[in-house]
Amino acid sequence: MTNPGTLPESIRYCVVGAGIHGLSTAWHLARELKARGTGSGDDIVVIEKSAAGAGPSGIACGVVRNNYFQPAMRELMAHSVEVWDANAEAFEYHPVGYLQISYDEMRDDVLTIHEQQKDIGYESEFIDGEAETHAYMKGIFDDWRATGVSSVLHEKKGGYAHNMATVNGLLAKVQAEGVTVVSETLVTELVVDGGAVTHVVARRGVESSVIAVDHVIAAAGPWVPKLWEMLDLPDTTDIVSGGTTHTVPTWKFWALQEGTLDVDPGYLMNNAGDMPPVVHVDADATLCDEDGNVLVDGKWGIYYKPDFNFGGVQGGYMPYPVEKPWRDVAIDPYGPASPDFVVGEDFRAVWAAALSHCQSRFEGKAHLMSREPSGGIGAFTPDSFPVFDTFCDNVYVIADSNHGFKMVGVGALVAKELVGDVQGLLEPFRYSRYSLGKLHPESNSPYPWS
């Protein structure tokens, strides 16, 4: 192990990014190398441009769910939930379950999810019908009153985790394995020679270092497009669908909308006085504020939970696309420090109204919406699903398309691939799926990632 904060002159594995994926990969890779007698954490360095969890991982809502229409996503998330369950205390993970409450158009999709969850042994319950949905939700929250919904998928596994507690838990595991984590250091160049990356150039302050590498793991969240560009990979991607080829930008950004209602988290306990499941509602009822003004005339979706980490009822609303080429998007400063991508009054009004639409306890509470800056952006792939694949012979790209925080187990699978064991759970997420037309099915959810 090199001294903390010191870059090595050469290293076998260089991980770029100290968020969920970078840290999980480093931790699991160190364990894989040790178990096989082929190395240890001393063979790995993690380079982070700021500090661990300074990107989306550190501001994430922390929801852990299996609710995906795509079979490959469900199977991948079932694996990650096992990792969450096995490390619940270290990651401050709360397995309270997850509720997907949906409108009519989503009914068949959600029923399919339930049926296929049974096939993979992921426990859930499906409630069908408007009256049945209302009765089921009243059994959890006696003030439930949402309209425009007619089914419930109740996942008995899943829940949520405290974001920075999870990051710090992973960081402790990484450092316990002897991995060096270097912060405040920016990767400025990936030197390609003979089709592979031979050196990583990194700058700390005004000093640059050149590191000889055998493998690079690009796990930089919304900064992955910058690493992609360093590798001279394509700006556009050809997608084959229905016998037709469509050329689309490889990367696009979406702005995330999350916030907190400043009430005691205990305000959202269930009828038994216990922590409730995470609530996700997709409705097609007109959404109005307390004065009767129409805020949304059409489909909308929110998610929320009591959260002692955020200090209130925390959650979010549908993201919106950033309508400009990715190079024109100011990724930094990231998150709440951004002058461009923090939520405004429109979000606060809609989210507070949606809470009140669902539960009467939130009526008249719009003025309690936190004014603390919140928000962030995510780099999305051409189909809004992850890409996990090797490029330039020795660069493993983890592009999670903003599904990331919940996928804490992806690092375990990537680690196995880095030592030569191809993982079936990752096969559906290769970049080649676009040109081969092996696309994930699309749901009727108003969200781009469900």
Predicted regions and their residues:
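Beta1/beta-strand and adjacent pyrophosphate-binding region of the FAD-binding site
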Residues: 5-21, 45
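Helix-loop-beta segment of a Rossmann-like dinucleotide-binding subdomain
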Residues: 7-10, 92-100, 134-178, 197-201, ...
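C-terminal catalytic lobe of FAD-dependent flavoproteins
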Residues: 321, 325-331, 342-450
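Flavin-dependent oxidoreductases
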Residues: 24, 65, 190-341, 364, ...
